[in-house]
Every structure is written in structure tokens, then in C-alpha cells.
A protein has these predicted regions:
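Active-site charged/polar residues at nucleotide-handling catalytic sites that mediate phosphoryl
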Residues: 61
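Extracytoplasmic small-molecule ligand-binding "clamshell" domains
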Residues: 30-31, 37-58
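Charged, low-complexity surface patches
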Residues: 17, 46-47, 100, 149
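Contiguous mixed-secondary-structure segments that line small-molecule binding/active-site clefts
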Residues: 26, 52, 56, 64-65, ...
Length: 162
């Protein structure tokens, strides 16, 4: 008997997230052989869907799994908002150390308790820095008078009206 697993993401061909999704799916196939068929929809956005739909499609059972930004769950698991704050995590190494430790385990449990999702692991989407083509940004004040695109996330948008 073959088990079918559907997995999806929202990034294009060159994205590190897409490449990581491929590695995940290929690893499952290699480790489980003919007992699994893995279908990876690499970019639902390209097909007219919104990235945030990954969660509802997984909850409904249409998908078995997906990757997504923790920002999409911050309203349901407010503790995830810690990693949405700009200038909070100084570098990747510290972020990995924190997420691979007790806090990462606690966050995974909170996600499961509040949403039913199981966290398989964490990866970075960049330390929450802000980049632009105009000037360096080192502290929040450096963003004055700039238009900045954000996710639909209160932590990202807080203060944007000042």
C-alpha cells in the first residue's frame, strides 16, 4: 500500500524555501521508498492562491503539510510574534540556538495546542531586518517617512501610522 502525502509552499523556483521543500520531499521518498508518494506544489501563489491559504488548506485536509511564515499564525499563537519583531534577534546563530532549545519546543507545543498543527522544524526567513534601496536602517527611527510592505500581521504593522 502506498501513502500519498501532499505538501505545498508559496515561493518560486529560485527560493531557498522551495529548495528546502524539495529536499524534505526527496528525503521522505528516499527513506520510505515505494511506500510513499509525495506531491509538492511548490508555489500556490503562481496558481492564483494566497500564501495564507496554506493553513486553511492544511486544516481542511486538502494538504497534508506546508511551510509558511510564523507570522501567519501569530494571531492564534501570539508567542510567535517574538520573531516578527524587527531588531530583536541579532543573528541567525542565536535564532537557531533559541529555536533548537527549550523555547523552540515550547513554541511547537503552543502551536499544536492552539491550532492542531505539528511543527516539524524551524527555518529562517531572514532575521527581521528591513532592507531598501535608499539608506541604511539600523534602528526604528531610520524608517521615518518610508513606505514599507508588511505581512498581514499586527506586529509588523504596529507603529506604521506614525
Amino acid at each position: 500500500m502506498t501513502t500519498r502525502l501532499t505538501f505545498a509552499g508559496y515561493q518560486g523556483e529560485g527560493s531557498v524555501h522551495t529548495r528546502a521543500g524539495r529536499v524534505f520531499c526527496e528525503t521522505l521518498k528516499r527513506e520510505l521508498g515505494d511506500s510513499i508518494q509525495v506531491d509538492f506544489d511548490e508555489n500556490i501563489v503562481q496558481k492564483g492562491h494566497k500564501a495564507a491559504e496554506l493553513l486553511s488548506r492544511t486544516e481542511s485536509g486538502e494538504l497534508d503539510g506546508c511551510y509558511f511564515s510564523s507570522s501567519y499564525l501569530a494571531a492564534r499563537v501570539p508567542e510567535l510574534g517574538l520573531f516578527d519583531q524587527h531588531f530583536v534577534v541579532p543573528d541567525r546563530q542565536r535564532a537557531y540556538a533559541v529555536l533548537d532549545g527549550a523555547l523552540g519546543k515550547r513554541l511547537a507545543q503552543e502551536v499544536e495546542d492552539r491550532t492542531g498543527f505539528t511543527v516539524l522544524g524551524y527555518w529562517d526567513n531572514g532575521v527581521r531586518n528591513i532592507s531598501n534601496a535608499h539608506r541604511p536602517i539600523h534602528k526604528p527611527h531610520d524608517c521615518t517617512d518610508m513606505k514599507i510592505r508588511t505581512l498581514d500581521n499586527d506586529n509588523h504593522q504596529r507603529g506604521s501610522d506614525h
